[in-house]
Amino acid sequence: MDKFFDKLQAVADRYEELGELLSDPEVISDSQRFMKLSKEMGNIRETVEKYNHYKEVTSQIEENDELLHEKLDDEMNAMVKDDLKNLNAEKDQLEHEITLLMLPKDPNDDKNIIMEIHGAAGGDEASLFAADLFNMYSKYAERQGWQVEVADRNETEVGGFKEIVLIISGDKVYSKLKYESGAHRVQRVPVTESAGRVHTSTATVGVMPEAQDVDIDIDQKDIRTDVFRSSGAGGQHINKTSSAVRMTHLPTGIVVSMQDQRSQQQNRAKAMEILRARVYDYYQSREQNEYDAERKSAVGTGDRSERIRTYNFPQNRVTDHRIGLTLNKLDRVMNGELDEVIDALVLADQAEKMERLTNE
């Protein structure tokens, strides 16, 4: 714990240093540097304020401990002990709050996301489950006050999705939905199953932070763009002009096709938005994989092939395999009531980071 408080003191020292720098005329005259340092100071202000309060509380605890060694009447002794009990409770709470504030911040947490849902193993049933997941996330987003835009979709004849791409915008979307990347398994009796047997199918979900030009610089020379005619479910012809767009990022081989928008220009813009996010995610994931090779994380935010959750319809049960969470309220989860699952994942991630922070 001493190392932890050494880190905390270093943050407090940096805060003081930033205060001095921000009053330096040379820094004030450099607006870009001034804004950068102001942001850094703002990011650690709450941590330093709580740390200062923590030091005041521990000082009061020491004073009360000393008082108890003096000759006090019964009433005074009881008052000091009661005060000490409250101070120790406050100290424990402050330690918890400070530890949370000291956890490494994910720079993408405030971003909007691009979510890709694919029907995987299981044919028509997998595509129908992909549609169910789309509805689940859409309802959850609505509960959060977020906006959902369908960027592209590839429908099947049974009303499911081979693939659907969403852009979800709002407050801290990535911070809550980043844990959804992975393979989602469903166990239920398909509508086409006459014998009433339970089948297992899979859909995969990919969650990427929406990337801006400032996040990643993609050279236009690295992109090959092809245009083709749009087609609907089952090959139905939609557009006689070549409005659909396929973009290939040559250095990574990432391909994005877009045909859901009304014009080639709109498809180009949307394809570029998705491509930027995928390329950003590609390089971020590569860095994360190198990091994870050193520290194995239980609550991952990446590999789409990793089975993360099972939805058992006959037993109305959902299980998140990463944290061993089982809820017997699948009907409510599929209706967008995801808070209990997501909150548990956030807490597990925080606990893991906390343990790492105190052990380092």
Curated annotation (Swiss-Prot):
Gene3D superfamilies: 3.30.160.20, 3.30.70.1660, 6.10.140.1950
Bilayer-spanning residue ranges: none
MF terms in GO: translation release factor activity, codon specific
Residues carrying N5-methylglutamine: 236
Keywords tagged on the record: Cytoplasm, Methylation, Protein biosynthesis
SMART domains, per database record: PCRF
Annotated localization: Cytoplasm
Post-translational modification: Methylated by PrmC. Methylation increases the termination efficiency of RF1.
One Pfam entry name: PCRF
A cellular-component GO term for this protein: cytoplasm
Top-rank lineage group of the source organism: Bacteria
Family under the similarity heading: Belongs to the prokaryotic/mitochondrial release factor family.
NCBIfam families: prfA, PRK00591.1
PANTHER family linked: LD18447P
Function, as annotated: Peptide chain release factor 1 directs the termination of translation in response to the peptide chain termination codons UAG and UAA.
Protein name: Peptide chain release factor 1
UniProt organism field: Lactiplantibacillus plantarum (strain ATCC BAA-793 / NCIMB 8826 / WCFS1) (Lactobacillus plantarum)
Gene from which this protein is expressed: prfA
